[in-house]
């Protein structure tokens, strides 16, 4: 179910935008954040 995966991913980063970079799940996603340094 690719749809479920996509929704889950979108929901997660939408609910926890700050926690996303703290968790350090994906460096590419962290760089997507405007106020989040890629080095952090």
Swiss-Prot record:
<feature type="region of interest" description="Disordered">
    <location>
        <begin position="1"/>
        <end position="40"/>
    </location>
</feature>
<feature type="compositionally biased region" description="Basic residues">
    <location>
        <begin position="10"/>
        <end position="23"/>
    </location>
</feature>
<protein>
    <recommendedName>
        <fullName>Putative protein FAM86JP</fullName>
    </recommendedName>
</protein>
């Amino acid at each position: 179910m690719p749809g479920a995966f996509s929704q889950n991913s979108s929901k997660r980063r939408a609910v926890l935008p700050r926690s996303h970079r703290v968790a350090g799940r994906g460096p590419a996603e962290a760089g997507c954040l405007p106020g989040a340094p890629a080095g952090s």
